[in-house]
Amino acid sequence: MSSIETTELTVDHQQNYDGVFPQVIACDTDGADLSHVQEWIAANKAKVLNDLSKHGAILFRGFPVLSDLDFDSFVQAFGLDGFTYQESLSNAVRKNRTEKVFTANEAPPAVSIFLHHEMAQTPLYPSKLFFYCEKAAEEGGATPICRSDILLKELEARAPQ
């Protein structure tokens, strides 16, 4: 097998701003493994990054990414610049799982984390984020995402200066 087949899906609460948000790409190839995913990324990197720019977020579904190490390999396959959590100078409590993969937050489940720009308070912040769900929450647990550019336009329309 030299590559994998993918399709675009729709999901609940998907929005449309001159393109769907988020875009959802599903792996349709039974028996695919991480090496097939890496080949697919190599062959489709330019399109995926262009789609990311257009749609604002991409949700990958059904890809064989089964551990933090697989996730690290998935992200590294894009060949993007990155940095370690320590380099970010953030003071949030997180644990490194690999050199460039760290937990999102170590707060107790009862603590709500509201919508925010990742590492906006630090001098070094990411231009792209990758999230991986290792274990889904038994209830709740959603990770809300927002098109900040669209939100700003909406706020300016509703509350002009």
Residue ranges and their predicted role:
Residues 2-161:
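Non-heme Fe(II) oxygenase catalytic core, chiefly the N-lobe of the double-stranded beta-helix
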